[in-house]
């Protein structure tokens, strides 16, 4: 959404906390992460445990009468709305606009006559039907729907899995931008009508064509102060997650064409390179954060927990400039870390990179089976960590293939250590292969011989981060101090 000279964006965050990241840009190219609209996910107790692939689906970001609005669908609970006068927050608690199973991908529209509407899709896994779009009238304050709505588009015959609709009014037409065909191999469809409830005409306005940008999937249309039109959308890049693309929009005869029509078939293809948007000026390069020196009183905005966090999991000591993770017990009957809530993770920032961290491990003297270290997490995972055992401290490397199905870890390396301070490293290649290594002095690193092919998460890419877990119950915990978390690319 654009407000004046400023652009704002949010995205699906599923089950992680904090959720609904808020990004700000001056030119649609350089984006700064400025906060999150959802510090905790509701219902709180439900999301105190990892709910992979659930939670926040396909939000819409809007600005209306001096306030910012975010609408999102939770497929298990319904359609929620949050609002704020400042996009940095504070944001209101999520308000349930419509309760129901399988209600997803909402997008509001405030019309010129003061009436309001909401378009949404359905998740077949909960609703028992998909590939349809519904428009309902909404109270102008955005808090609830005034009717059950009407099906305005049926994609079953030619546009299966149409979803992620975004609602606009432009030059007398109601437009719904919506991808169809699925995340991996879909295309962008646009619907238009002079009447909010239809009938709607439709046209395919962008597809993969001869490019290597598969999808292209959900996104939003925005204009610049200079009158240009652009479309931001995501591409499913497997283990690297859903990466963002920017494409030009050109209008002809009341229809948008997104990207460039290279073969004159009337359908745009995503651009790999293009001039930047003309926003009336130039702006400095800005990128979302990744490295963290832990020299602030708060975690960097790039970090997210696997579930709603407890305030006893982490402490940043600005005097010592380190992050302390206290161990917390593994969930009952956990066969691996897939359902562990207290994993501190962040997205992959590039196709190839190296992460370094320095850790001092101080486990409890009660021999609780504590383990702390570095992890790459997805539907499978690999970790390099220090672990306390009955006969001392060990450096261990473990992999859980098919962790999502309960597969136990396999130990590929274990070495007894004479020190509790260790430098841990992982490097990711362009092909998505991770190698782990360690050092006791920060200069000479020993590589773990077993490489790990990175596996994506549930509708997200793989993540990298830190953890501290224990096997047993006690009245206190040990801890691990991390001096930094540094990326090099």
Question: Residue spans of the language-model regions?
Answer:
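Carbohydrate-active catalytic/glycan-binding domains of CAZyme proteins
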Residues: 1-489
